[in-house]
Each structure stands twice: as C-alpha cells, then as structure tokens.
Amino acid sequence: MNNKNDIENKCLERGVRLTDQRKLIAKVMSESGDHPDVDELHQRVNKFDSKISIATVYRTVKLFEEAGVVAKHDFKGTKSRYEKA
C-alpha cells in the first residue's frame, strides 16, 4: 500500500467514490504528521485548492469516517480530531 496516500487506497478498497476534491483531502490527511481538526484540515487543503469549502471538508471527513478509513477522536473541551484508521 502506498503510505503517501493510504486513505485514498482504503477508500478505493471500500468502494468510496473519489472526486478530485476528495482525493486532495485524502492526500493531505494521509501526509499529515498530526491529528488535525476539520478547520486545520481545511486550511491545509486550501493551500492547494482555495475553492474547496469548509462544508466540503466536513462532508468528506464524515464520509471517510463512515467508511472506516479515518478515526474520529473527541477530547473534552476541544474540537474533534482525525487520524488514519
């Protein structure tokens, strides 16, 4: 498996349809060395494509979570953070 974009690979294995925007979000998440929240992820994705909205990032992260390719972590008093599952 290509570690550079293992989220994309897992999506393909699970039959998740990947648009160009979803591929970019998967790439940014896969290459992340930390556990970003959606706002941080949106800022990083916007460096590559400023047309991707925060709503698109939220929907995509939720889709990835439901497909079991990312894990959501809730910490008391902070925003949810995400990592590769």
Residue ranges of predicted features:
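Basic amphipathic alpha-helical segments that dock to polyanions
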Residues: 57-67
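DNA-recognition alpha helix
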Residues: 39-50
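Short helix-coil-helix linker/hinge
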Residues: 18-20
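Short, Lys/Arg-enriched N-terminal segment that forms or immediately precedes the first helix
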Residues: 1-15
